[in-house]
């Protein structure tokens, strides 16, 4: 798919998109059939989030095929070429708010409280269950509005999607945080990343309401896309990795403490710098002039530098924890215990 896009071979791109869609459909069907038996539990709603995400990946892959044909096929029908921007917006909605959003939203229902080292809110499953059909229906409405060129319909659909995400994921996380707030870098990154995604979604809804057509929406939302990626999705990934990596490496409590200690180095400064830089970048995005350009550049340098530090610390933390794990396994006490 990617190779076809880079080489302008639209047949290869469509083939790749078809394969991706078919695999996603297969995966979704497997989850659906398994969830009725082996995965049936109190948390089965999380699996339903993943099934819905797989559905929207199929939709996004299908739309990607049409967009590719509109872009690269000289013999594409006129109606398809004219619908390119509308289909692109619908494709983005299915991919970001559907596939990525539903996957991360469902995961955060359980991962968020776990990273905060507290219990899930007693009503978390109820909130997530109530929000899912609202999320899916509103996203279908938003996508339909995009395809038909009705930006107001897209705006309303997006706003309801944001509300559903806030209800199903945000409210339970906040209620859990009120019991025991985030105290570690991973938990803070997860919470702030989720907050930025909701902000970006609300911004997209506003831009859609103001836009005259899909082309105008694409242009107006360009300033928000880096924020969605760097401040939203990026922080979610970093937060998940920061919490999960020490757990996966293991080695016992002492080894885990070594890894966590490295990952927590300068955590408040990194978190503050990243999010203040994101706020600054968003605030000056609509301004013009040399000063605004310099502020924007400085903000992005700081923001990206925090991720560079994250990468370095993840590497150092993994190495340090692995060494502590090996040292613990080869200590005389451990060896003696094994012989006994």
Where are the predicted features?
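Hydrophobic alpha-helical transmembrane segments of multi-pass integral membrane proteins
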Residues: 1-340
């Amino acid at each position: 798919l990617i190779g076809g896009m880079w080489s302008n071979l639209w047949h290869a791109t469509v083939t790749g998109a078809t394969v991706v869609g078919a695999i996603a459909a297969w995966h979704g069907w497997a989850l659906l059939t398994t969830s009725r038996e082996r995965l049936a539990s109190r948390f089965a709603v999380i699996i339903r989030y993943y099934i819905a995400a797989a559905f929207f990946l199929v939709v996004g892959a299908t739309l990607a095929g049409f967009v590719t044909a509109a872009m690269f096929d000289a013999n594409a029908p006129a109606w398809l070429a004219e619908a390119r921007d509308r289909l692109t917006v619908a494709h983005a909605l299915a991919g970001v708010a559907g596939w990525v959003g539903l996957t991360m939203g469902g995961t955060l229902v359980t991962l968020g409280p776990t990273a905060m080292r507290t219990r899930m809110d007693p009503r978390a499953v109820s909130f997530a269950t109530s929000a899912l059909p609202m999320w899916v229906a509103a996203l279908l409405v938003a996508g339909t509005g995009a395809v038909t060129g009705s930006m107001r319909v897209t705006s309303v659909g997006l706003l309801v999607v944001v509300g559903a995400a806030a209800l199903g994921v945000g409210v339970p996380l906040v209620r859990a945080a009120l019991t025991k707030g985030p105290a570690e870098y991973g938990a803070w990154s997860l919470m702030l990343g989720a907050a930025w995604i909701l902000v970006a979604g609300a911004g997209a809804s506003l831009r859609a309401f103001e836009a005259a057509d899909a082309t105008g929406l694409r242009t107006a939302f360009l300033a928000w896309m880096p924020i969605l990626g760097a401040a939203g999705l990026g922080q979610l990934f970093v937060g998940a990795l920061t919490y999960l990596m020490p757990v996966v490496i293991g080695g016992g409590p002492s080894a885990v403490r070594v890894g966590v200690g490295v990952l927590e180095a300068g955590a408040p400064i990194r978190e503050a710098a990243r999010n203040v830089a994101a706020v600054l970048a968003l605030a000056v995005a609509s301004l013009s002039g040399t000063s605004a350009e310099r502020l924007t550049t400085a903000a992005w340098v700081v923001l990206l530098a925090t991720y560079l530090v994250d990468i370095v610390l993840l590497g150092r933390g993994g190495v340090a924890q692995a060494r502590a794990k090996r040292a613990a396994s080869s200590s005389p006490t451990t060896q003696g215990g094994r012989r006994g």
